[in-house]
Regions:
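Conserved functional loop/turn residues at catalytic and ligand-binding sites
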Residues: 62, 149, 211
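Short acidic, glycine/proline-rich loop/turn micro-motifs
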Residues: 16-21, 104-105, 125
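A ligand-binding cleft/hinge motif common to bilobed small-molecule-binding domains
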Residues: 52, 56-59, 68-78, 125, ...
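Extended ligand-binding regions for polar small-molecule ligands
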Residues: 26-38, 96-120, 124, 158-161, ...
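Short beta-strand->loop
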Residues: 79-87, 91, 131-133, 169-181, ...
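Hydrophobic/proline-rich hinge and linker segments of small-molecule sensing/allosteric domains
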Residues: 5-10, 80-102, 115, 187-191
Length: 230
């Protein structure tokens, strides 16, 4: 059995967190366990305090793998990516009294986005009129909108549904689902391990819609779309 070191997002509930005992739990954790059981690869978690620290560890090759992330031009500088495991739309979140947003490029507003995320990278480039407020966690992004310190946040549908329901952000709502901003979540593999990427892909293409939906259902009630572009 070969083993690989994995860096994760320690604060991305319900996708993944490191719990108080340092255990990797959540949707991504369960899917990665399923992949590792299909391949007989032992995956060891390298603990970090933040997603940004995980990115630094990955760049320093202190971990071979990065859990559940979008492929972006910046990340491709040091990572190669598996096939997408699943896609999850991003949604714009505002307060109950916020107007529906038809076109993000036409508005001036402040938007809270966690640092080091794909949306942080893309929104800076795509929407120069938006004032981006960098935050350290999902929770902080939702709180800033709730406390009127930011007008909006953009987060994954699964994250948003979970936070609004489970964490009681009941004065927040989904305002829009911007086109072409889905999360195509993959595993990132450091560039000098191309064989490892090929091995992971062998298991990823065998994952069924039912297997993934069953895992998602353990954490949140939401319908999942499988990416059919392998």
């Amino acid at each position: 059995v070969c083993s690989s070191d994995l860096c994760v997002d320690p604060d991305w509930e319900p996708f993944e967190i490191l719990d108080k005992n340092g255990k990797h739990v959540g949707i991504a954790a369960d899917i990665i366990r399923l992949i590792s059981s299909k391949l007989e690869i032992e995956i060891k978690i390298i603990p970090t305090k933040t997603w940004e620290e995980s990115i630094e560890f990955s760049k320093e090759e202190r971990c071979d793998l990065m859990s559940f992330l979008n492929e972006t031009p910046q990340r491709k500088e040091w990572l190669t990516f598996t096939e997408p495991i699943f896609k999850d739309p991003n949604v714009i979140i505002g307060r109950l009294d916020s107007p529906i947003i038809k076109d993000l490029s036409k508005i001036k507003a402040s938007i809270a986005i966690p640092k080091g995320t794909a949306m942080y990278e893309r929104f800076q480039k795509d929407f120069p009129k938006l004032i981006i407020i960098p935050v350290n966690s999902e929770d902080e992004a939702f709180k800033l909108v709730e406390e009127k310190k930011a007008d909006l946040t953009v987060r994954s549908m699964i994250i948003s549904a979970f936070n609004i329901k489970e964490k009681g952000f009941f004065n927040l709502k989904i305002l829009n689902q911007p086109e072409n901003y889905e999360n195509h979540l993959r595993i990132g593999v450091i560039k000098d391990e191309p064989v490892l990427k090929d091995i992971l892909n062998k298991a990823i293409v065998t994952l069924t819609k039912e297997e993934i939906q069953n895992i998602i259902n353990r954490w949140v009630a939401i319908k999942y779309e499988k990416v059919e572009d392998y």
